[in-house]
Amino acid sequence: YDFSNLRPHVDFFNAMTYDIHGGWSSHAGHNSPLYQSPPGDADGSIETGINYLANTRGLPEEKINMGIPFWGKKYNTSSINGSFTGSVIDMHYSEILPLVGNGWTYQWDNTAKCPYLIKDDQSKIITYDNPLSIQHKCEYAQNRNLGGVMVWALGYDDMASEESLTGAINLYWLNIEKSKKSILPEEIELNTYPNPFNPKMKINFYLPYKTEVNLSLYDMRGRL
């Protein structure tokens, strides 16, 4: 792409910072490592991808959105960076989550800042993202002043239960943004009293960014 011509006309660029490793790779590896693992890995990482877009292609970092995958990859291998055989299978997070502790052992790669699972018989591994790795990714994006984060795909989350990956982005990205940009008071109190001529009350307010709002209603005796 001719980024120099695109820059003035595009609000943001979604960087697909996943599929770093796969069936085309010379070894197994994380789907979306924040940093190269092993160090210097030629397949790269999120950081090397963002560096390329910013430093080599000249994209303003504030226009780059980091991609976060809600899926992982299953390899026929016994180690995270080992050689593998056969096909590499994509798996949704909703399919991976029930496996943790059920025939699969959880591992954390502190270099890549990513989790993975090893099958108890040492025959397979699954690389994926979880709320902890998403926390590291959101904090990295914030520290580099990136434009934001984007995901592929919302429907791959554990939709039947907690939607924990979506919740992690809400917690670690939106709360970071709130602390950075907040111009609203943390609390505001409104007093209203019964009116037989107007028994209904409507409260309108505008929020300049996404955030959670908690409303507490008390009666005349101060009871919640």
Predicted regions and their residues:
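Conserved, well-ordered alpha-helix/loop/beta-strand core segments that scaffold catalytic motifs
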Residues: 140-147
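Glycan-binding loop/region signatures in secreted carbohydrate-active enzymes
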Residues: 24, 30, 63-140, 167-173
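Substrate-binding surface in catalytic domains of secreted glycosidases
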Residues: 1-99
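Generic structural signal for well-ordered alpha-helices
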Residues: 3, 46-51, 138, 163-170
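Acidic-and-aromatic substrate-binding clefts and catalytic sites of carbohydrate-active enzymes
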Residues: 155-160
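C-terminal outer-membrane/trafficking sorting elements
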Residues: 180-224
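Short, compositionally biased serine/threonine- and acidic-rich segments at solvent-exposed termini, linkers
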Residues: 174-178
